[in-house]
Amino acid sequence: MSFSRRQFIQVSGLAMCIGAAPLLVRASKNQQTALPVPPLLESRGGQPLFLTLQKAHWTFDGQYKTSVWGINGQYLGPTIRVHKNDDVKLIYSNRLAEPVSMTVSGLQLPGTLTGGVARQISPGSDWSPVLPIRQQAATCWYHANTPNRMAPHVYKGLAGMWLVEDETSRHLPLPKHYGVNDFPVILQDKRLDNFGVPEYQPASDSGFIGNTLLVNGVQNPFIEVSRGWIRLRLLNASNARRYQLQIGDGRPFYMIGTDLGLLPAPIAVQQLSLAPGERREVLIDMSKEDEVVVTAGESAGVLDKLRGLFEPSTVLISSTVLTIKATGLLSLVTDNLPSRLIDDVTPVSSVIRNREIYLDDNTPGINGALWDMNRVDITSQQGTWERWIVNASAPQPFHIEGVQFKLINHNGEAPQPQDYGWKDTVWVDGRVELLVYMNQPSYEHFPFLYYSQILEMADRGSVGQLVTIPVNQ
């Protein structure tokens, strides 16, 4: 980057003053905020769950409150917990001034229940779907998927975590006390003005990248926990930024789950990637340490911060995701890390079809075509397996609704251990091969979508439509 003479003089003057008058961005790095834990909503006894989409007030910087969008009166929504074999009635109420559609990424549902064009909720209206929960335990997320407006709607705050539990997860010796040793950790990046108001000006040829890392809506959060294992349910709800997470002292994460459920066994990983839309569950051993810090790469240096005064920066002011502080003595009864979690015995029948998917780089579209709500791009059959080969010259995440898949290879090489397990979102940097199971039916007027998970690219047309013919037709 080059500076004009005037900018150079300004930067030089500011640099001389750093020691005497620290910049706000510099001072804020060391301020810690208790991690906000979203309220927990559970389906019990057939009672409906109410989700009101409305304006709210929130502080992103700990100083100024600003108007945001939210769910049930706060930025981001409550965490919803449901159980396998529940039939969950939702009541979405739109109290905003524009149409919104909502979906739950990770829930295995028919196309009639996945939001989108046909399920837009007009201002002042409700949508009351009944969702049959028939899948194994998983960490999912619900969010706006409004046609051509998904990126700004998610950025403004229409998102939350959705947990599915089953008998297996209930009986495993894993941390499961919500907000005590089992935490939702929702990562986003924003750009805030001097009054803590989010700015949203995405580049015309890519997705929005901010310079301020937020976790559950705040900067530099911490939690206090008892000694023992803790569980973090990680969700990347950013529009376009991918994170590389690690623990500051070099210890490993013990990864136990990915997008669509638990892994057969815990996997120790030193560094964890998290693309937009991806979820991962990890355990961290806090039995012997007083403090552990989870980070997302390098923080901005002084010069990067100074540059950010003159032009938008994409370097994170602070890379701290979460500081974990252990208190008290180790309990006399502690659970060891289980060596086995679940049996993955899904039978794979023969693959009936191979498909090639090409994601355009800086121009929107899939296989050279922009999204058209009146066009079906792929027709498949429920209960069958397909091999999808997804290509991207510019790295980006890719998501498919209504299916579950496993990553078979990435650029001809076996997947990394952190990419084991059933998924619905994958990072594509070159060429990936996916084994896709067509789990749910969809229809011409209620198709599944597959799209670039860079939300601005999806809004511009990097979306295709999938009809999965029901098994009895």
Curated annotation (Swiss-Prot):
- Its primary localisation, in coarse terms, equals periplasm
Q: Where is the signal peptide?
A: 1-27
Regions crossing the membrane? none
Please report the PTM annotation for this entry: Predicted to be exported by the Tat system. The position of the signal peptide cleavage has not been experimentally proven.
Q: Any idea which UniProt keywords this protein has?
A: Cell cycle, Cell division, Periplasm, Signal
Q: Which PROSITE patterns does this UniProt record tie to the protein?
A: TAT
Q: Name one GO cellular component term.
A: outer membrane-bounded periplasmic space
List GO molecular-function terms, semicolon-separated.
copper ion binding; oxidoreductase activity
Gene3D superfamilies linked to this entry = Cupredoxins - blue copper proteins
- Keyword field contains Methyltransferase: no
Q: Which InterPro entries match?
A: Cu-oxidase-like_N, Cu-oxidase_C, Cu-oxidase_fam, Cupredoxin, FtsP, TAT_signal
Q: Does the keyword Glycosyltransferase feature in the UniProt annotation?
A: no
Q: Which biological process terms from the Gene Ontology are attached to this UniProt entry? A: FtsZ-dependent cytokinesis
Which compartments does it reside in?
A: Periplasm
NCBIfam families recorded for this chain?
A: PRK10883.1
Q: Which family does it belong to?
A: Belongs to the FtsP family.
- What is this protein's function? Cell division protein that is required for growth during stress conditions. May be involved in protecting or stabilizing the divisomal assembly under conditions of stress.
HAMAP family on file: FtsP
- Protein name in the entry: Cell division protein FtsP
Source organism per UniProt? Photorhabdus laumondii subsp. laumondii (strain DSM 15139 / CIP 105565 / TT01) (Photorhabdus luminescens subsp. laumondii)
